[in-house]
Amino acid sequence: MLVRRLFQPSTLHWAWRTTALNHPLGRHQGGLRWTHSGGRSYRAVIFDTGGVLVPSPGTVAVGWEVQNHVPSGTIVKAFIRGGDSGPWIRFIKGEITTEHFLEEFGRLCSEIAKTSVPVSSYFSLLTSEQVTKQFPVMTQAISQIRAKGLQTAVLTNNFHLSSGESFLPLDRKQFDVVVESCLEGICKPDPRIFQLCLQRLSLQPSEAIFLDDLGSNLKVAASLGIHTIKVDRPETAVKELEALLGFPLHLGVPNTRPVRKTMAIPQDALEKYLKGLLGTHSTGPMELLQFDHGQSNPTYYIRLADRQLVLRKKPSGTLLPSAHAIEREFRIMKALANAGVPVPTVLDLCEDSSIIGTPFYLMEYCPGIIYKDPSLPGLEPSRREAIYTAMNQVLCRIHSVDLQATSLDSFGKQGDYIPRQVQTWTKQYRAAETSSIPAMERLIQWLPLHLPRQQRTTLVHGDFRLDNLIFHPEKAEVLAVLDWELSTLGDPFADVAYSCLAYYLPSSFPILRGFRDQDVTKLGIPTVEEYFRMYCLNMGIPPIDNWNFYMAFSFFRVAAILQGVYKRSLTGQASSATAQQSGKLTESMAELAWDFATKEGFRVFKEMPATKTLSRSYHAWAGPRSPRTPKGVRGHSTVAAASPSHEAKGGLVISPEGLSPAVRKLYEQLVQFIEQKVYPLEPELQRHQASADRWSPSPLIEDLKEKAKAEGLWNLFLPLETDPEKKYGAGLTNVEYAHLCEVMGMSLYASEIFNCSAPDTGNMEILVRYGTEEQKARWLVPLLEGRIRSCFAMTEPQVASSDASNIEASIKEEDGCYVINGHKWWTSGILDPRCKLCVFMGKTDPQAPRHQQQSMLLVPMDSPGITVIRPLSVFGLEDPPGGHGEVRFKDVRVPKENILLGPGRGFEIAQGRLGPGRIHHCMRLIGYSERALALMKTRVMSRTAFGKPLVEQGTILADIARSRVEIEQARLLVLKAAHLMDVAGNKTAALDIAMIKMVVPSMAYHVIDRAIQAFGAAGLSSDYPLAQFFGWARALRFADGPDEVHQLTVAKMELKNQSRMQEPAVPRV
C-alpha cells in the first residue's frame, strides 16, 4: 500500500538481494480455477490497497497541501528522499515507531518546503475514516470473485499505528491472505514480497492477477509471471478484470446493495400488492435491493418477472411536520410527464401503510448513469463541460414549465417563497435540534432581516444536484430528474444556488462531495460564474447581485436537513449508512452558511459602485437604516457643503455631517453598534482581561465580531488608494475612515471587534500593497476573515529602535532559504493563541546603503526556533490576549518566497506601512479624548466639592475649554493629513503625517489626564476606561517612532521648505 506507487522506477535505485526465501514456492493444492476464454486460468486476485481499494495517499496529499498552504509535492518528495534509508521506507518496513517517523518525516518535509509542515495533520487525515473507505465497486468485485470460489489477497505497503496495530483500513474477512510490509520487513517492489504472497496462496505466478496503480510494482510482478492490471480508475480496472476472469464483477443494478436490516420491508405483502397492480403471475422470486444513496426517503430496486421498478417510501417512525412528502413527488412527476422535463414514469401512489409500514409510490426503473462525484473523475474535460451544460439546461426547462398548462399553478403558494422557506427550515431544525449551534442561531436571526426584495415564481425542484440526475450512458443527456419531494412554487435562484453547492465543498467532504480544492478550469467544469451566466442566458434574464444570500440560505437548508438526518440516525430511522456522520457536519454547514452571510453585500449605498456579480469580497455592506442623529455624536457648526465622491476628492470633510450619504449611514450604524452592543459589555470584557482566562480570546468579543461582520462593519480600514477595486475592504478614503476610526476609539475593544486593530491592519495593508498572490492567499485572506491574528517584529532591546537602520537582527540566505537570528521586543500580538504570522524586519545586507540593508519576511509562527521569552506590560497593563512579547529568533528557516517585495526593501515597506497606520492611531486617540471629555463633563455636573458643584469650579471650566480646543485642533490636523494622502499621496503628506504623530498623542495624554483629575481616585480605577486610555496614550508617544523623531523630521522639512514666506533680509548699514 501507500507511497511506493507514487514513484517512477527511475526514482529509486534498489539494490536487489539475490538470496531466495527460506521456503520455496508451494504448488497449488487444488481449489477452483477460473479459465478465461483465451485459455488462461486464474485462481486468485491480489489487490494493492492505496489507489486500488481506497484513495491513494498521493491524492490525499495533493488536497491536504492546498488546504494547509504547503508547497505542492512536498509530501511525495519526502517519501522519496533517502531511498531505503529514508524515514518512509523504514516506517513501512516496521523498523521505526510512528512517533520516530513523524519526527523525522516532519523535519524532512520542513526542509523540503522551507517552512514548518504539520505532518501530524496529514498523517491523521491519511488514516482517518473519511479517506479510507473502500471503493464500492471494488467491494462488489471482491464479493463476486469469492462467490465464484476464487481466492483474494491484499498485498500492501503499510505501517504500524501508535497503538502498535498495523494500519489496514479494510475488512480482513474479504481476503484469504493478507501480506503487510510492516509485519514482513520487506516492501514492494521487492520481488520477495510478491513471492511470499504467492506462497501463502499456494499458487504459481501464472495463476494470479495483481492490481496496483504504480508501474514499478506492476513491472516486478509481471517479471515473476503474474498477470497485472494498472489501476487508474477503479471502475475501469474492474472492467478489465471482468474481461480476464470472464464473469461479471458488479451487481446488476448500479448503486444498489442488499437491504440493510434496519431498512427491511415486508416482501410477501409487497409482492402480493405488486402482482395485483401489474397483473403479473410469475412464480419466480421478487428481487429487492436498496439504493445506496438517498438520505431522506428510503429507495429500493425491485425486479419482478420482466418488470424493473423503483419504490420510494417514507421513513418509519415519527417524522417532522411536512417532511418526506412522497405524495408531492408522485404528483409532480405525474404532472411533468408531458411537460418537457425528463422524469421517470410513475405507476402508483399507495397511501395504505398496512402493506409495508408507510406510504410509498412506484415508478419505472430508468437505466443510466448517476454521477455521485461532482468532479466527474475519469471523464474527458469536454465531457465534463457537456454534462454540466446539460444539467444547466434541464434546470432551465424546470423553471420554464407552464404552470397553468400542467395544472401546477396551485402546487404551492405564489410569492414569499424565501421567507416561508426560512421559517420552514427553522422549524425543521428546531424540531430536530440536539444541541445549540451558534452559527445556526445567528443565521436564524440574520436571514429574515436580509431577504431578497424581488423574487420570481416558477416551479422549483428544491434539491437540484448532479446526483439527482440520471444521464445517458453514452452522451451528455439527462434521462430523468429524481427526488422531487421538496418541489414547490418558488424562487428559481434558490435552485440555481443549491445546484452550486459542490463549488464550495471539498472533495473529502462526506455525504455531499465537492471540488473546492480542485481546479475546475483544468477539469473542464464551468466556473460558478460561468454556470450562473449560462443559466441567465438560457432563461433570458439579467443576473442577480445578491448571490451570497442565496448561498447562505442554501447551506442553512443543508444544515437543517443534516440535523434531521442525524436525529433520525439516533433512532435508526435514517436510510443511509452515512447518516450518523451528519451530526458532525451540521455545524460545519452552518459555519459555511454564516461565512456567506457575512460576505453578503446588499448594495445599500446607492452612491457606491456596484460589486461584480459573484466576485468574492471580504467586506459586506449592511442593510439600510433610517437616518437619525445618534446619541453622543459630536456636532460642529462648520459642515461641508457637499459630499465628495470617491472619484472627485475635492473638499476636506471636517465633520461626519459632510460625509456622503452612504458613508454617513455607515458612520451612524457604527455609532449605534458601539452604543448598543459594546458599551454595555465593557465591564464584563474588562473582567475577562483581568481573569485567569485572559490569554484566551473572549467569547463576547468573538460574538461581537460575528455580529459586526453580519452588519457589514468589517475591514473598513483599507484605503481606496491601496484597494481600488474594493476586493478586500470597504473602499473608503483615508478621510472617510478617519471619521469612523474616531468612533472606534471611543471603546478600547472596538478595533478588534471590527477587525481594524493593530498590528493586523498594518500587516494586512502591506500584504495588499506588496504581497504576491500566494502570500495573499496564505496570509491575507485568513487575516481579513478574522480566522488568524498576526504580529510585527521590528523593535530590539539592544539598540535605539527609533532609528530603524540600527536593527541588528540578521536575515541570511542559506541552502535556498532565509535563516533568521535576532532578539526582538514589544512585538505586539505575539502572545495571542490565534497569532499565526510574524512580519519580521532584519538586515539582509549590512554593507548596502543605510536604507537598503533591511528586508521584511513573512514568518509562520509555528516555525522552529521562535521563543517568546516573556510578556511585557504597559504601566502594568498586559493587554491580553495579544499582549506584547520579548522574543528570540534562533536559526529560524523561512522559504525564500516568503520575502516581501525583495531583499533590501524593508525600510521602504515600513514607511509605506506607517502612513495610514498613523492616521488610525491618531484618530483613535481623538476618540479616547472625546470619550474622556464626555465622561469628565458628566462627572463634574454630578459632584459637589466645597459647597458647590465641580462644574462651577474655575479650574474645571478652564480644563474643559482647553480640552475642547486641543481636540478640535488635533482633529483638523489629522483630517488635513488624511486628505493630503487621498489627493496627493503619502509622500506629499509626509510633513503632515509627522506633525499629527507629534501632536495627537501628547494632546490625548493631557486631555485624559484632566479627566482623571476631575474624577479623583475613581479615574485611576478599572471602573472607568480612563486609566487604560491614559496608559495607551502615553505608550503611543513611542509607537511608530517617538515624539522627538517626528519633531526632528518636521524641523528638517520646515528648513528645507523655501516656499514659506520669509522675512526680508535686514539691510546692512
UniProtKB/Swiss-Prot annotation:
First-tier enzyme category under EC: oxidoreductase
Family label: Belongs to the acyl-CoA dehydrogenase family.
Binding site for FAD: 792-802, 828, 943, 1013, 1044
Gene Ontology annotations of biological process type: carboxylic acid catabolic process
Modified residues (N6-acetyllysine): K427, K1052
Secreted listed as a keyword: no
Gene: Acad10
Enzyme Commission number(s) of this protein: 1.3.99.-
Its job: Acyl-CoA dehydrogenase only active with R- and S-2-methyl-C15-CoA.
GO MF terms held by the record: flavin adenine dinucleotide binding; oxidoreductase activity, acting on the CH-CH group of donors
Reaction it catalyzes: a 2,3-saturated acyl-CoA + A = a 2,3-dehydroacyl-CoA + AH2
Recorded GO CC terms: mitochondrion
Cofactors named for this entry: FAD
InterPro entries documented for this protein: ACAD10-like (IPR052898), ACAD10_11_N (IPR041726), Acyl-CoA_Oxase/DH_mid-dom (IPR006091), Acyl-CoA_Oxase/DH_mid-dom_sf (IPR046373), AcylCo_DH-like_C (IPR036250), AcylCo_DH/oxidase_C (IPR009075), AcylCoA_DH/ox_N (IPR013786), AcylCoA_DH/ox_N_sf (IPR037069)
Pfam families: Acyl-CoA_dh_1, Acyl-CoA_dh_M, Acyl-CoA_dh_N, APH, Hydrolase
Protein name: Acyl-CoA dehydrogenase family member 10
PANTHER family: AMINOGLYCOSIDE PHOSPHOTRANSFERASE DOMAIN-CONTAINING PROTEIN, HYDROLASE, PUTATIVE (AFU_ORTHOLOGUE AFUA_1G12880)-RELATED
Residue positions where N6-succinyllysine is found in the record: K413, K427, K1052
Classification via CDD domains: ACAD10_11_N-like, HAD_sEH-N_like
Keyword list, A-Z: Acetylation, FAD, Flavoprotein, Oxidoreductase
